[in-house]
Amino acid sequence: MASFMLIILYTTFMNLEHDICYQALKTRDARFDGRFFTGVSSTGIFCRPICPASTPKPENCTFYPSASAAINAGFRPCLRCRPESAPASPAWLGTEATVRRALRLIEDGALDDGQSLSELCARLGIGERHLRRLFQSHLGASPKQIAQTRRLMFAKKLLVQTKAPITEIALGSGFNSLRRFNDAYKTAFGFAPSHERKNKSEETNTQETVLHFNFRPPYDWDGLLSFFKERALDEIETVSMTSYERLICIEGHKGSLRVSCDEKKNRLKAVIKDIPTAHLKTVSRKIRRLFDVDADPVGIAHDLSHDPVLMPLVKAHPGLRLPGAWDGFEIAVRAIIGQQISVKGARTICNRLVERIGTGLFPTADEIMNADLDGLGLTGRRITTLKKLSENWCGLDKAKPVEETLKELCALPGIGPWTAHYIVMRSFGEPDIYPVDDLALLRGLEKLGQPCTKADLKERAQNWRPWRAYGALYLWRAS
């Protein structure tokens, strides 16, 4: 009965049917956290499905596809369940690819610091009216409202979880003045930002910040750590049985990051050292993508289980996550180095590369362009490919359709479809991209008693959409 109800909730979610959403609200199921928000007319607040408060009467509930839509309707966020802590909307929200690309750019700050909607639309190649119509249809709010809500929610998160000065939080959240931040905060939440700091210890500029990132269970933390451990670079990353650590650099500020998982509370804990408040938004975005925090495991499992070969793998490894990238260029370089050699061999060469550059961090595009790469174990062709990638990396625009990005990558010497798809899958976190022509996928199917050709695999993968990346991950597990 529970599984049947889960399927109904998933398949009807996008329509936000009142009875179905209310059933999810009553059960406080964390698997639906962030997939909708409940506006309660009797209190004027909106909540997450997991809110510990008494369940409101159904006639007092209105369901919204985003926090922005709830705020736009006049509701204020609940102080108990704190909607600012909810996982972000799943990447598949709305089947419209333009919406996904626009959301990614907004998350990267495309509408912060006075940047205009017309500039965003120019990058996307569509008109403002059309983009507003798409956002209203899929998210219940305009692009500017979505961007404003994200700024406010991140600021609220920092106010609650850190001791950073309010001025720094305002600027670090994407507001270009403290006055505008205060006005927007009061309008959205009904009180000043300073209210969040009442009865709390004094503001300080500390070298260590702790942030929490809620996720939808289940979460295959052990599987993700295993993937990262096998590929960890000696001078940069440390992966233990329970945590992932790495050195980081944001706009010239060197620091470190340690992430662990609290499965009981369905959240990751990130300890960030020596990174100013102004750059915590960037760090937060990178963490969410690296650990695939906003994935929808219920939807993924539901769709992939239609394939009888994948069904037992999905059951055996619930909550599989797509390993993302701290830095997209790093993954691209490692993908090229890893062409046609083992994971261990690629790791050895990457360690030599990091040691050769000597900064204690993964090399930037400029550093690789100007570096002597001879003697690392790379062929002359690989070196040429790395130099060309470094020269052209900045020209790859996330606003473009993914098909165009794949074509641009494949146009570079030494990069074929496998490498291009792998780069886009991990660097851009694309859930529906997988490395075509990957022999390990064919080996996985063969081990599962389903030998097939590349053409057969391509046809089979059409049934995994929009989760082909996750389907590939499951077959890699089997291989």
Identify the residue ranges that each predicted region occupies.
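HhH-family (HhH-GPD) DNA N-glycosylase catalytic core used in base-excision repair
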Residues: 2-479
